Amino acid sequence: MSNSQVTPETLSEYLAHLPMTAEQRAELAGCTSFTELHERLSSSTFDAPTDAAQASVGRRLTLNTAEELQDAEMLVLDASGRVCLKATPPIRRTRVVPEPWRTNILVRGWRRLTGRSNPPAPPKDERVLPAARWRTVGSIRRYILLVLMLGQTIVAGWYMKGIMPYQGWSLVDFDEIRNQTLLQTATQVLPYALQTSILIMFGILFCWVSAGFWTALMGFLELLTGHDKYRISGKSAGDEPIPKDARTALVMPICNEDVPRVFAGLRATFESVAATGDLDRFDFFVLSDSNDADICIAEQQAWLDVCREAGGFGKIFYRRRRRRVKRKSGNLDDFCRRWGGDYKYMVVLDADSVMSGECLTSLVRLMEATPDAGIIQTAPRASGMDTLYARMQQFATRVYGPLFTAGLHFWQLGESHYWGHNAIIRMKPFIEHCALAPLPGKGAFAGSILSHDFVEAALMRRAGWGVWIAYDLPGSYEELPPNLLDELKRDRRWCHGNLMNFRLFLVKGMHPVHRAVFLTGVMSYLSAPLWFLFLVLSTALLAVNTLMEPQYFMAPRQLYPLWPQWHPDKAVALFSTTIVLLFLPKLLSIILIWAKGAKEFGGKFKVTLSMLLEMLFSMLLAPVRMIFHTRFVLAAFLGWAATWNSPQRDDDSTPWGEAIKRHGTQTLLGFFWALLVVWLNPSFLWWLVPIVGSLMLSIPVSVISSRVGLGLKSRDESLFLIPEEYNPPQALLSTDKYTHENRWHALNDGFVRSVVDPQQNALACALATSRHAQAEPIEYLRAERVRHALKVGPAGLNNGERLALLSDPVALARLHEQVWSEGHAEWLAAWRESIKADPHAPLLPLQPLSSQAQPA
């Protein structure tokens, strides 16, 4: 601790970074020490010099925000009399108890056989979803879908069997095989084993493609006719007043995100809700799990800025967890436990989500009009990105996505999907039934659930509440990854999460629809290794037919040879059918746009050309995704950890070096695979060119498609144009505007500034959450942390040490005071360099207009 004399230059520099008038600075310029300065700022005196900086936090914080903070009653004192900023509402705890999973059906069966009951579940408000016509209709529709899928697959499998050169196992004499050598057995049996494996792979994959086809077809008919008596959005008139007790919390869980973009979207959503006149029914929560000290400080400043600029004090709240348990689902659990009892509904937003006020108020009205609904999911529309890759993906989701979403609703009705964001949730049943316990056991598929959304929807339905998709409700938006590699990083997490969720397939009480959802979640990624295996087996069969002498006589005393067969007519028919199933949904999407109006998509010609280019691009990327997803599935089964880093939210180009590193193995695989096929049978290469050619081109395709310039040029040519670009809604215009403004004055080097900068330190101290009473062990730990920080400087502190300082208002204030009073060069130099390197920081000194100079 120090109370040393301060030089006029140092004092002047400190005062220059406080928003004061010249008269106020002149009055404080006579201070002989920083202790005296803080005492005069706080109008108090202290025995311990380093306590003065803590006491002046409130004064430093309110020099230019006093009126806003006082009007909203944001400044309060903690139990020790220290100033803190009321960034969250008062806590009213609610009991949130996850039910342990009993995933082993054999253990459950054994306990029943031996007369031992399972441990009793905690009492809950159980209910049964009331009988309704839509439930019967939904069941009938799903049986029809199952018949259509299986019927198509059986017919296609029969055709595929007829294409195979060796027809069945009937002429294989297994008794004779026992007396043969292993080589002779392999020579006879290997072609049949390969054919059977190929046929099995084909059946699974064709059934998967068939499900997508029928979903898109029914979605097309729903959207074309516009007649859907079971759509959830028809339950509300759309203009009835929202009851006072229908309070809704908009929660945005974030973790090391792009801070300017996050708070731009939040502000746009907030202002859109305010424009509806129903803002008093909504509160906004930013729930941070960030563990990067610089990002944490940037979040705090961004929260203060958005509250000040949008009038959000008392409506927009910010909370950062110190104990990051169970990732996003744990973050939501923590919110429900602290404040969930204060709200009837909760809308979950992703970090890149934007929702209009009309959409949000409509969701609340739909919940009020549908008392049996537990979750209503909107269909977010992708927009806001400029790279060529992202614009093609935006176009694909905007053009083809509505068919599949409407089709999902057609088959599932009130037993549908929840995608984890841009959805409204009924709070009481969610708290009682949807808390997620970790999966039992050890290994890669145990522990905290990664993909929580499907599981929460299944638990909500198991508890007797409906889960709906409001596929036709506008005003819900999200952003997509800017390039292929960022999308694949996200896919690895989703792959691991979906594979984990399949452990819940046989959990007692799950509705069959949600068991099917778990299955489709697995197939979304397991289809990749199945397709890869199908191609490998096909190549192996080619090698067998080329390199091995055909066995025309398979049985003793066989009179006639067994000739390999070839039916080109069946092959052409099967190939044509598969192409139709894959590409007809895209053509139907374009037909629907032609019928509804193609102007906002660039016109009929441009939207059709965009579809053809997107189809070509998707064909180039499909084999690349196949290889990556195969690796992800293998990695999950082998126990390789899936990191949970936040995806890139801004437009970002892929460097050549990164592309070579990630795609190099695929390029070599495609090259050697092509050489092998040419060596075996050059004519077969034409069938494999779409696969091996795409793999060999993966590096340039990945790099070129990530370019912003090409994306902007395609937009100038009205290619891949979507309505949100042609005529942007106000929420997206505001998001774009605020994102640019936030980036202009974004806070960099936040930790250094929180220690050295007078106002940033005051904000960090006011928001610090570790507010312990005075105790000798705590004081010793604080002194050690401050001493260590002064000794090693900002560069010598690891992230954990930085976070510990940010959490302790006393230690942070003491460190701030000693850095200035003792003139620690490393800290001051780092702070000055940070300000110098930031060309968009506010001009210094921060001097407000005097009362005489203020404009009228």
UniProtKB/Swiss-Prot annotation:
The chain crosses the membrane at residues 144-164, 198-218, 517-537, 574-594, 608-628, 691-711. It is a multi-pass membrane protein. InterPro entries: Glucans_biosynth_gluTrFase_H (IPR023725), Glyco_trans_2-like (IPR001173), Glycosyltr_2/OpgH_subfam (IPR050321), Nucleotide-diphossugar_trans (IPR029044). CDD domains: Glucan_BSP_MdoH. One of its GO terms (cellular component) is plasma membrane. Keywords: Cell inner membrane, Cell membrane, Glycosyltransferase, Membrane, Transferase, Transmembrane, Transmembrane helix. It comes from the Bacteria. Belongs to the glycosyltransferase 2 family. OpgH subfamily. This is Glucans biosynthesis glucosyltransferase H. It comes from Pseudomonas fluorescens (strain SBW25).
